[in-house]
């Protein structure tokens, strides 16, 4: 027989009272202040900075090929963080529609908190709609960004087909 796990009702006054008293929470272990914030975090931050500086000194990598003012590249690409919107403008036949689609991105991001606001859980596995929308948006943005680096005829298939 399968065991049914009941989800807690966070609007229940009895449960709220128990949580307010401290029931259901762990109060053991090492406190974050001052141990983590004063000792561990600076070590991690300084270690990360030392790693970046050390790698830059040991193996300085070129950011790209040197600029040649007398040769114009065949295709001018924007910075990497603008690849998805550049791909939208490149692929959509009507430029006004492309601008409207780019303007709809912030509007879509503003709607994300309202998609599944009735669900009080924070665990992504208990919020399937919000998790699915987030994963779809992330994969779609990556697909657009990677496609922007290909020629226009191969940008939809990413050169795979």
Swiss-Prot record:
Keywords assigned by UniProt, alphabetized: Electron transport, Membrane, Photosynthesis, Thylakoid, Transmembrane, Transmembrane helix, Transport
Domain of life from the UniProt record: Bacteria
Membrane topology: Multi-pass membrane protein
Protein's cellular compartments: Cellular thylakoid membrane
GO cellular component: plasma membrane-derived thylakoid membrane
NCBIfam families associated with the record: cytb6_f_IV (TIGR01156)
Role description: Component of the cytochrome b6-f complex, which mediates electron transfer between photosystem II (PSII) and photosystem I (PSI), cyclic electron flow around PSI, and state transitions.
Protein name: Cytochrome b6-f complex subunit 4
Lineage, highest ranks first: Bacteria, Bacillati, Cyanobacteriota, Cyanophyceae, Gomontiellales
Annotated gene: petD
